[in-house]
């Protein structure tokens, strides 16, 4: 499937956001979701499960090997159009293959943060240039960060990455593969992660009661981070009914069973209840903060430098520094050679002068001897 191919998907959206009329009034509604986290956390499977389609191809061993061999992090884009009863949502999903896959993952989140800022920058430039041309909104409305759970909560990489990304996008933490933990273990891990998020002042998205009833908003908020199970396969339960989930020798994990995972809660947050809030908070909070900072810190009309500009300027700076260093070394070598030659000349002159002094002293001695000899001969 082409990454830019638009797919017409007819999905059963149980309930559109409670402020559906506000969405319908728009000529079109765009929702951009970013999937971030280390490989193997189930990002692709989750998205295909959420929208009941193979919007993103499952990664094979060869694909993963190629990504690691590249040793680069990139942002890949897939597009689709969700439609129901004449209501259209232009959906864009962004994947981040290569995130956290290398031995040295220092600042691996910078590529993602720069991409997020670049979308805000494009929107800002359009605001400054013209209001007549329709704006193409490529801003990311929500980032689902797939946490790699460990006994003490989460890895330092996840903590640092989430802390950085939370200032650029609506961040929703997700614990993937929840069926690998027992219920008590999952409860403890959730508590530890919530404590870490609070201690590190990581700003995650909290659903508001303005966009859904109090009970729903409170339930969604208290369930953070969302523990999910993803599967595109149907399994047969003990009673003979079919359900989407995973089958194990000891039982079945169902993705739509709220006692098993938070998949339905996350779906309510993204699609059913708080989609409009994600879009609006991106506009009113995140973008406005970016816009205010940029207009305050730089001259009007001057676009923000992109990564490649910084790289070019840094390369030029390094070239100038190398040239200066080379010229300095050449000058020092020139004067050092001159100094050595002058010292050699000085030593030669001093040696010659010493020889003259020795000859003078020898002549003076001879003169004194002649005077003494002549004096003795005169007395006789």
Curated annotation (Swiss-Prot):
Coiled-coil segments: 304-380
Gene encoding this chain? Answer: spn6
What's one Pfam family the UniProt record gives for this protein? Septin
Q: What is this protein called?
A: Septin homolog spn6
Keywords linked to the UniProt accession: Coiled coil, Cytoplasm, GTP-binding, Meiosis, Membrane, Nucleotide-binding, Sporulation
Tell me what organism the protein belongs to.
Schizosaccharomyces pombe (strain 972 / ATCC 24843)
Assembly and partners are described as: Component of the sporulation-specific septin complex composed of at least spn2, spn5, spn6 and spn7.
What is the protein's membrane topology class? Peripheral membrane protein
| Domain Septin-type G, first and last residues per copy | 27-297
């Amino acid at each position: 499937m082409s990454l830019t191919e638009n797919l017409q998907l007819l999905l059963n959206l149980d309930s559109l956001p409670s402020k559906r009329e506000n969405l319908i009034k728009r000529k079109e509604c765009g929702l951009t979701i970013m999937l971030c986290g280390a490989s193997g956390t189930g990002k692709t499977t989750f998205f295909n499960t959420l929208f009941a389609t193979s919007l993103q191809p499952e990664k094979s061993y060869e694909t993963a090997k190629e990504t690691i061999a590249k040793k680069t992090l990139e942002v890949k884009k897939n597009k689709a159009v969700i439609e129901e009863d004449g209501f259209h949502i232009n959906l864009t999903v962004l994947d981040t293959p290569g995130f956290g896959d290398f031995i040295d993952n220092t600042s691996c989140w910078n590529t993602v943060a720069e991409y997020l800022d670049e979308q805000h920058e494009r929107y800002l430039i359009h605001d400054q240039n013209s209001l007549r041309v329709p704006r193409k909104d490529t801003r990311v409305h929500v980032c689902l960060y797939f946490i790699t759970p460990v006994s003490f909560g989460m890895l330092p990489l996840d903590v640092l990455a989430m802390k950085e990304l939370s200032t650029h996008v609506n961040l929703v933490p997700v614990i993937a593969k929840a069926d690998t933990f027992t219920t008590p273990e999952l409860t403890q891990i959730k508590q530890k992660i919530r404590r870490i998020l609070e201690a590190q002042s990581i700003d995650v998205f909290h659903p508001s009661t303005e966009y859904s009833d109090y009970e729903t908003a409170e339930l969604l908020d208290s369930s953070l981070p969302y523990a999910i199970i993803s599967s595109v396969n149907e399994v047969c339960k003990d009673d003979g009914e079919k359900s989407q989930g995973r089958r194990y020798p000891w039982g079945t994990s169902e993705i739509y069973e709220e006692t098993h995972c938070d998949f339905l809660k996350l779906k309510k947050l993204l699609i059913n209840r708080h989609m409009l809030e994600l879009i609006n908070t991106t506009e009113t909070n995140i973008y406005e903060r970016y816009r205010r900072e940029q207009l305050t810190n730089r001259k009007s009309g001057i676009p923000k430098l992109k990564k490649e500009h910084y790289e070019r300027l840094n390369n030029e700076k390094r070239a100038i520094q190398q040239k200066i260093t080379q010229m300095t070394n050449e000058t020092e070598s020139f004067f050092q050679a001159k100094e050595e030659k002058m010292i050699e000349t000085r030593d030669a002159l001093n040696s010659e002068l010493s020889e003259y002094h020795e000859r003078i002293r020898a002549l003076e001695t001879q003169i004194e001897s002649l005077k003494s000899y002549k004096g003795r001969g005169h007395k006789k």
